[in-house]
């Protein structure tokens, strides 16, 4: 049995009883990485020297002081688009191949305040653009459940590392499903918080109105622990919300009697695989057995979500990625005769194909002749999608459906068909457009590959999302299933 089979509360008890040391946890993490990461390829950079030194320091603090951080001694992996001082941050892109940040992201600082131990940086789709982690310039991360399949994306490294037992917890980012989709594919728990719940300061921007950092864990309880540690307003991020952070752990009561669940017919219709549909219907029976009720509803504008998302996110990416020019930091071409040539060649050589595709799409949508027809119209449709969610939440407590239309697909299966690849996020994208919280929890297997149940809540009501997810988790054994590596 791995130490990482224990929850945070159990690990903290073992530490305080002196049955294990924090150094043991860190050692377990690096040993596991050494044993399996040549197959999984989740990590891009390790911070072993600093992590081991910090673990020893925390070991001495077990008796040395009475107050300890919320995540005292817990090893964690961080997605490679979250800046870490003194630890290379590349966004899995050649254009940032040697970028060594001079500051920590707010979430990293909050992890340090909670006394977590950063193990290393995790692979991802370049600049978080992708659904399979096949767009990384450095590594091809594989799904621990089947090494021939993708782990999902863009936080594929974050989900795969937790599923493979390399770290018990990780941070990812979610712009259109990039935490929930890989969590579903890898059989772990992943939450996208409400937009503004967690500071984005130090998150390398893809689409600033959609990006949100969130936790990936083995259990719902651990997920709530991590969100507790990283949530809250931040003066360095004007989009972080000045709202109270509730005690998320207190919501894990297991009691969902009388809870009203909405199930959108669009989430179980055309394009959703039989296995995903059946796993959700089975999950609804479990929730009914716990005292909740459910009804079918409609989110009529969700059929426009995919097009809306790719217009808006690509437009924002076009603006955000303009800063990578070969002048200030990152990669610079050697094949330029003048300044304009330097810009062109640096970006042509430094960005991968998917990133260039989205920059071009965004630049086109923002151009003078097409702004009203595309970008402005997409903003209007986004408002309608948000209104659909608001209307449903007037009557219901949560929305439930599959996280993904299918389980993980084979590596290389969709790389030549961007539209098929984009459709993998069709059930997660509306949640980002509406800015509401959503979680994926394991709800079964199809041909040996995990499936995820998506639970969506009202703005800043992660507590109810956690309550439902935890009740389902406790009533089933899906979260106990682990891949054999």
UniProtKB/Swiss-Prot annotation:
Gene3D superfamilies in UniProt: Amidase signature (AS) domain
Any Gene Ontology CC annotation: glutamyl-tRNA(Gln) amidotransferase complex
Keyword ATP-binding set for record: yes
Pfam assignment, any one: Amidase
Record keyword ATP-binding present: yes
EC number: 6.3.5.7
Location of the active site: 79 (charge relay system), 154 (charge relay system), 178 (acyl-ester intermediate)
Substrates-to-products reaction catalysed: L-glutamyl-tRNA(Gln) + L-glutamine + ATP + H2O = L-glutaminyl-tRNA(Gln) + L-glutamate + ADP + phosphate + H(+)
GO molecular function: ATP binding; glutaminyl-tRNA synthase (glutamine-hydrolyzing) activity
Keywords: ATP-binding, Ligase, Nucleotide-binding, Protein biosynthesis
Alphabetical GO biological process terms: translation
HAMAP family for the chain: GatA (MF_00120)
Function: Allows the formation of correctly charged Gln-tRNA(Gln) through the transamidation of misacylated Glu-tRNA(Gln) in organisms which lack glutaminyl-tRNA synthetase. The reaction takes place in the presence of glutamine and ATP through an activated gamma-phospho-Glu-tRNA(Gln).
Assembly notes: Heterotrimer of A, B and C subunits. Interacts with BrxC.
Family: Belongs to the amidase family. GatA subfamily.
The protein's name in its UniProt record: Glutamyl-tRNA(Gln) amidotransferase subunit A
Organism placement in taxonomy: Bacteria, Bacillati, Bacillota, Bacilli, Bacillales
